[in-house]
Amino acid sequence: MTNTRKTHPLXKIINHSFIDLPAPSNISAWWNFGSLLGLCLIIQILTGLFLAMHYTSDTMTAFSSVTHICRDVNYGWLIRYMHANGASMFFICLFLHVGRGMYYGSYIYFETWNIGVILLFAVMATAFMGYVLPWGQMSFWGATVITNLLSAIPYIGTTLVEWIWGGFSVDKATLTRFFAFHFILPFIIAALAMVHLLFLHETGSNNPSGLISDSDKIPFHPYYTIKDTLGVLLLILTLMALVLFSPDLLGDPDNYTPANPLSTPPHIKPEWYFLFAYAILRSIPNKLGGVLALVFSILILMLFPLLHLSKQRSMMFRPLSQCVFWILVADLFTLTWIGGQPVEHPFIIIGQLASILYFAIILLILPTVSMIENKLLKW
């Protein structure tokens, strides 16, 4: 008799995705982050759902409702900090997942890659709107500064900003709509993640060598289910250590002050995971130029399949490209550091140089080095 998991319409889909899926035999721990991102999304949706049961999206009561969650709701503090730090874990996994794709040439599957970039944008938008909800000082001023960037769009900019605000400043209407969008977007992200997997399973996974592995496949279960379980345990351990020992480590103290439109904080800065993009935005003295650089700093990922000039897919056997890749990683760390610093000498010039280097590496240096490697290998 045929196994139910291979015949039942629903069980069949799960079977082809997570059980009998043919997977390369040599994929490393860098391939764990897909499942970890799925776990992060589930954690965020569940904790977010319970927070939404007690949260009120009104300017008068939003801050108090978050305080109420932390003080009066059973384990409310735990749910709140799991949600806040869960976002940080989400972005750590995201950056490592994208970095893995860049290093091993996973972007050659361009449909999967482009949906991934759209997912990155969606997660960034969700995180930004979520940061506004507690209605602290940094929530309010972050929302004001970032939404105001749209006013740089010629002709329609100002109208667009007022349309997003639902008035002439960030106020009750803005908070309510941000809450609505923050609630719906994770479900859209979940749907997009399924499409991401659908396209991935059309081609099968890439592997560290970048070679076709059709002749050497193993079933996903039990080999990679057990491997993913280790990743899951490590992620939960890290998250809970952060939540239980140092929940405010990655937050901003300014957000414990209720929003006050009459008092601007000395340094307006976003959460740590946006600092690299914020540094690129600030490094250009022109408003529209800064906004374009900000958008393009993420959108540039979509160009990776077009900029791949190497005859080899992966960087595993390309030491020159590896060197450039790690310089890019160091550059992103530098940008993250600069994004959190005040706008003064020497941080301004460091930020500008780091921004130029970021775009130069991706658009110019990596493709050039790839061609040099082709020549060295007489390809």
UniProtKB/Swiss-Prot annotation:
Membrane-crossing segments per the record: 33-53, 77-98, 113-133, 178-198, 226-246, 288-308, 320-340, 347-367
InterPro entries: Cyt_b/b6_C, Cyt_b/b6_C_sf, Cyt_b/b6_N, Cytb/b6-like_sf, Cytochrome_b, Cytochrome_b_C_euk/bac, Cytochrome_b_N_euk/bac, Di-haem_cyt_TM
Top-level division of the source organism's lineage: Eukaryota
Membrane-topology annotation of the record: Multi-pass membrane protein
Any one of the GO BP annotations: mitochondrial electron transport, ubiquinol to cytochrome c
Molecular functions (GO terms): metal ion binding; ubiquinol-cytochrome-c reductase activity
Cofactor note: Binds 2 heme b groups non-covalently.
Any single Gene Ontology cellular-component annotation: mitochondrial inner membrane
Subunit structure: The cytochrome bc1 complex contains 11 subunits: 3 respiratory subunits (MT-CYB, CYC1 and UQCRFS1), 2 core proteins (UQCRC1 and UQCRC2) and 6 low-molecular weight proteins (UQCRH/QCR6, UQCRB/QCR7, UQCRQ/QCR8, UQCR10/QCR9, UQCR11/QCR10 and a cleavage product of UQCRFS1). This cytochrome bc1 complex then forms a dimer.
UniProt miscellaneous comment: Heme 1 (or BL or b562) is low-potential and absorbs at about 562 nm, and heme 2 (or BH or b566) is high-potential and absorbs at about 566 nm.
Protein function: Component of the ubiquinol-cytochrome c reductase complex (complex III or cytochrome b-c1 complex) that is part of the mitochondrial respiratory chain. The b-c1 complex mediates electron transfer from ubiquinol to cytochrome c. Contributes to the generation of a proton gradient across the mitochondrial membrane that is then used for ATP synthesis.
Family indicated by similarity: Belongs to the cytochrome b family.
Protein's name in the database: Cytochrome b
